[in-house]
Amino acid sequence: MSTAAQCPPPRPGGGGGDTTLAALSAHMAPCRDTTPEQLAQLIDVHLGDLRQEQPNWTISSSTVAGRGVFATRDIAAGELIFQERALVTGPTARKGQLSSCICCHETLPQTGFLCRHRCTLPVCETCSDSEEHQAECEHFRRWQPKDVDAEQEQVNPMSLRILTAVRVFHLGKEQRHLVDAMQANAERAYRREIIQAAQCFRNFPTTDRVFMDQLFRIVGVLNTNAFEAPCRSGGHETLLRGLFPLTAIMNHECTPNASHYFENGRLAVVRAARDIPKGGEITTTYTKILWGNLTRNIFLKMTKHFACDCVRCHDNTENGTYLSALFCREQGCRGLVIPVQTRTLQPDWRCITCENVFPHAKMAKYQDFALNTINNRINSCSVQDMIHFINELCPRFCPSSNYVLIEAKLNVIWRMTRFDHEEYTPEEMGHMDRYREEVLAILHKLGAGECTLKKLITGEIQ
């Protein structure tokens, strides 16, 4: 992700220095103004045996944002563009993701789950003594974790979050050069991540200016470029935080011409979703493809710090999918209301039937109501209850095209095909098949081609 990708950090405490936004931005720029040619050389080394003899892609300057990936020849839909191993992985440190070993990702027991060498990281007994864990274990022990003498065993998400950055310090020279060459957004909120991590240790080197500058930039690179990649181990699935540099260089498009997926958290696979002409920029998406225009652009503005200018963002019907649509609030009208201006974050909304215009504040409350109502059901209902809710109750307050309701249908599909192992009635299976066809029809209208979501829904990839 050239100008953005997963979240941002700011200048750490200790050592003083200029903390103006201009200074932060200069500090986070790619190392020594790395040229696309130099970046390509670093990527070649990183790819190793996965680099094709005659790749169908190249790295070049982009009019979208800085640098991008471009087709060196015509690429057919479905064709492999590249595969890439993660440069570094680590835990997401999200609630619900704290009970896996940071090395092998097996589920940990309820007691005795911290490293036996007292680094306070969640590591299984086998991995505690592994070479893979040794350097980071010594690193954390040198900083003297405050939780080491705690009466009750617990995983500290703040110190766990910084682990991926610590692993970057232990990469090889050329790998570190690649990290330095990557974009890192300047964001003051990053400072909190580092300060919160520092407060977990008695001997965190906050006064070491060189170290703190390096850490700040590494955290910036990770928050700007890292992906969350699912990894299955020992019969359960966890999310890893992985840095895939080439995948991250691809720029954003709301309905991209390429799609990516991950194999067990450590391998990214990128394929063409549509035909890509020679010289065309190869794009990915930084958002969910089925989110509505307004939701996507709020997410991009808040987390990636840019506004998208793609064709889809200029079409308030989104190719006739009406993913953002809500019901009209005018008495007696059941028409669809959609945002009038798709390029603003607080647009007026207009009914396409009665043409009444409603202020954003009113429609935002309506959308929030639908979002919260549906999400609460997703988090608490059985599959059978969700089907009843989607079919009988949702039509009273939410159009069938609204992206939140589409997410609910996807939730049922995932639970019935990927996670649940119970038997379902033919009627329940019929509802799931109908949801699948509805989602596939929306993807077709969007022109999403052979995207990852389509392949997941149809079972082409797991």
UniProtKB/Swiss-Prot annotation:
This is SET domain-containing protein SmydA-8, isoform A. Residues 55-287 form the SET domain. Keywords: Methyltransferase, S-adenosyl-L-methionine, Transferase. Transmembrane segments: none annotated. InterPro entries: SET_dom, SET_dom_sf, SET_SmydA-8. The keyword Transferase applies. It holds the Pfam family SET. Belongs to the class V-like SAM-binding methyltransferase superfamily. PROSITE patterns: SET (PS50280). GO terms for biological process: methylation; negative regulation of gene expression. It is an enzyme of class 2 (transferase). The gene is SmydA-8.
